[in-house]
Amino acid sequence: MNGVSEGTRGCSDRQPGVLTRDRSCSRKMNSSGCLSEEVGSLRPLTVVILSASIVVGVLGNGLVLWMTVFRMARTVSTVCFFHLALADFMLSLSLPIAMYYIVSRQWLLGEWACKLYITFVFLSYFASNCLLVFISVDRCISVLYPVWALNHRTVQRASWLAFGVWLLAAALCSAHLKFRTTRKWNGCTHCYLAFNSDNETAQIWIEGVVEGHIIGTIGHFLLGFLGPLAIIGTCAHLIRAKLLREGWVHANRPKRLLLVLVSAFFIFWSPFNVVLLVHLWRRVMLKEIYHPRMLLILQASFALGCVNSSLNPFLYVFVGRDFQEKFFQSLTSALARAFGEEEFLSSCPRGNAPRE
């Protein structure tokens, strides 16, 4: 469920003194069962968060999918938000397995399920992030180059570009399908990334785990968090700057949805990425390959990030105009206003408003 390797060989397989800071290792070797450390009430709280995300995410994104297919006109915006809702819907569907993993305190579904599940999770994760970038860039181009957008911004091209986003997401998560495996640690089976060979010595194996962890964590942080965040934020700034130059007094309005989306993305996913970096630091500096409490904290921060996917449908509807006004509208009209940028287009200077 995390973006980096989580399991290692058992204590007896490693050279003495390699993991000098992992005191939990010797303490647990006398137990034949799977024992895991707890961090207060973090495990049950994580299960509650995942449960809420499953219900809200499946229902909310499912409703958006149904309405964009059957109740709304097919435009560039509805194509983009359909694929974003699909990615969030897929991520929400995968959460029951994540919850089972956390409750069981170990991976019990086998190696191939480990490969397929983690690949599916990160396909949804990267697709959602890349689609947010795609939507932001699309709206930015529509504002900065309205004439070009009028001639080239078509539903067919948007569909092909969205398909390309899914291919990019598949490429970004393909390493999980090849290198994910399972291994027991202190009686607990975990699903983790393994770039190494079982025939290597313990010291070489440790170095391989750390090297793979560095590559995976930095790549995930840049491609799955910092990069999308920078692009979305830049697009929001460029939109507002262009409209201010053209004398639109309500320049903050079209920026509002992008601002809320990027803020929600940052708030909910930043803990997960910070924990990833802390986990990397502990492995590189403290030579700590595995720590059960860090694994639980990583799982909890991932659960918090999943809340973002379940909230996106509500952000589409309730951001842009006053909540009270949209609450009494039909849902179709509210989504149309969000996806079609009705309030933005109707307020742009005439002749400059981009069209679908």
UniProtKB/Swiss-Prot annotation:
Any one annotated GO CC term: plasma membrane
GO molecular function terms listed in the Swiss-Prot or TrEMBL record: complement receptor activity; G protein-coupled receptor activity; N-formyl peptide receptor activity
Tissue specificity as recorded in UniProt: Expressed in resting primary human macrophages.
Gene Ontology biological process terms from the UniProt entry: complement receptor mediated signaling pathway; G protein-coupled receptor signaling pathway; inflammatory response; phospholipase C-activating G protein-coupled receptor signaling pathway; positive regulation of cytosolic calcium ion concentration
Described function: G-protein coupled receptor that binds to several ligands including resolvin D1 (RvD1) with high affinity, leading to rapid and transient activation of numerous intracellular signaling pathways. In macrophages, enhances the RvD1-stimulated phagocytic and clearance functions. Macrophages migrate less toward different chemoattractant stimuli but phagocytose more microbial particles. Prevents the increase in Ca(2+) and activation of ERK1/2 used by histamine and its H1 receptor subtype to induce goblet cell secretion by activating PKC and GRK2 to counter-regulate the histamine receptor.
InterPro entries: Formyl_rcpt-rel (IPR000826), GPCR_Rhodpsn (IPR000276), GPCR_Rhodpsn_7TM (IPR017452)
Positions of glycan attachment: 30, 199
Cell membrane found in the keyword field: yes
CDD domains reported for this sequence: 7tmA_FPR-like
Protein name: Probable G-protein coupled receptor 32
Extracellular side: 1-44, 101-116, 179-220, 281-300
Membrane-traversing stretches: 45-67, 79-100, 117-137, 157-178, 221-241, 258-280, 301-320
Disulfide bonds: 114-191
Main location: membrane
Database matches in PROSITE patterns: G_PROTEIN_RECEP_F1_1 (PS00237), G_PROTEIN_RECEP_F1_2 (PS50262)
